[in-house]
């Protein structure tokens, strides 16, 4: 159920976020406690998840120091009390129809592409790579931005050029990789590998490219404990992969290839997911989630 904010017009609902109009140039982006997996919004909430995602994004927007959509601090007076800590006032942008994915390691859909073709998004890779192999250099592996309920599809850089033009495509690739490297280097000093992540970008009225939506959250990134890393096996994680793994386990009883939605998450998976998200935030930021603003603080 979305927040009823009397001062702002509700514009759209995503899998996790709600969007409201603040004025002609600004929007209110509210992160809920919903969680999605395999293109379904699950019938379970992760307590405090929206606050954790917001705290993580705010930390990384400051760390990477790239032009972004933030139009005020997390305690901006334009943010209603009932969503404080899980909402941000942002600039209205023309969003670009490309998911900008950076990969430092081979896993997920990238691994499936590689096993089928020896390539990821048209990029040829050496033979013999396995689950969680580290790339010599991070890869830009874009995807389409699917509508709610549809699948994102990996695409080649040539297709990005066709979609947004050569100049903008190069900007997206270069900015994505620069931001990823800076954040991944920081995370490694905190004992965490950021295996991959995805960004969204938009253009302001002057055509400037701005980083938007969420960044480096456990919803949009794979976080692995560095001291447990070993290529060739599925890694333990501090991210949404934990939920995906349970859904495809015998315990859940769910057939991913069937036509039924996933079952609700059991209490122990909900609690463990919350703990993992908080641990990722605290380890990477060096901050206590207990000190983050908003209801529940």
UniProtKB/Swiss-Prot annotation:
Q: What class of enzyme is it?
A: ligase
Known EC number: 6.3.2.6
Which pathway features in its UniProt record?
A: Purine metabolism; IMP biosynthesis via de novo pathway; 5-amino-1-(5-phospho-D-ribosyl)imidazole-4-carboxamide from 5-amino-1-(5-phospho-D-ribosyl)imidazole-4-carboxylate: step 1/2
Q: Which CDD domains would you find in this protein's record?
A: SAICAR_synt_Sc
Q: Please give the SUPFAM superfamilies that the UniProt record associates with this protein.
A: SAICAR synthase-like
Homology family = Belongs to the SAICAR synthetase family.
* Name the record gives this protein: Phosphoribosylaminoimidazole-succinocarboxamide synthase
State the organism of origin: Mycobacterium marinum (strain ATCC BAA-535 / M)
Lineage, opening ranks: Bacteria, Bacillati, Actinomycetota, Actinomycetes, Mycobacteriales
């Amino acid at each position: 159920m979305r927040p009823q904010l009397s001062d702002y017009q509700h514009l759209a609902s995503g899998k996790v976020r709600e969007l409201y109009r603040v004025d002609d140039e600004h929007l209110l982006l509210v992160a809920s406690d919903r969680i999605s997996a395999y293109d379904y919004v699950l019938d379970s909430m992760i307590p405090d998840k929206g606050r954790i995602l917001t705290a993580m994004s705010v930390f990384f927007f400051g760390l990477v120091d790239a032009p972004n959509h933030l139009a005020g601090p997390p305690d901006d007076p334009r943010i209603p009390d009932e969503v404080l800590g899980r909402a941000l006032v942002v600039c209205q942008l023309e969003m670009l129809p490309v998911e900008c994915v950076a990969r430092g390691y081979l896993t997920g859909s990238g691994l499936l592409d590689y096993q089928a073709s020896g390539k990821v998004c048209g990029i040829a890779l050496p033979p013999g790579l396995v689950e969680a192999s580290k790339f010599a250099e991070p890869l830009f592996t874009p995807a389409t931005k699917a509508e709610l309920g549809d699948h994102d599809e990996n695409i080649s850089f040539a297709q990005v050029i066709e979609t947004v033009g050569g100049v903008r495509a190069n900007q997206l690739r270069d900015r994505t990789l620069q931001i990823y490297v800076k954040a991944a280097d920081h995370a490694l000093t905190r004992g965490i590998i950021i295996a991959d992540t995805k960004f969204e970008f938009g253009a302001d009225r002057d055509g400037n490219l701005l980083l938007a939506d969420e960044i480096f959250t456990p919803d949009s990134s794979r976080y692995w404990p560095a001291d447990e890393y070993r290529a060739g096996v599925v890694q333990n994680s501090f991210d949404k992969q934990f939920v995906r793994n349970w859904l495809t386990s015998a315990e859940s009883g769910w057939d991913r290839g069937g036509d039924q939605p996933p079952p609700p998450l059991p209490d122990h998976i909900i609690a463990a997911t919350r703990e993992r998200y908080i641990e990722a935030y605290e380890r990477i930021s060096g901050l206590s989630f207990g000190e983050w603003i908003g209801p529940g603080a």
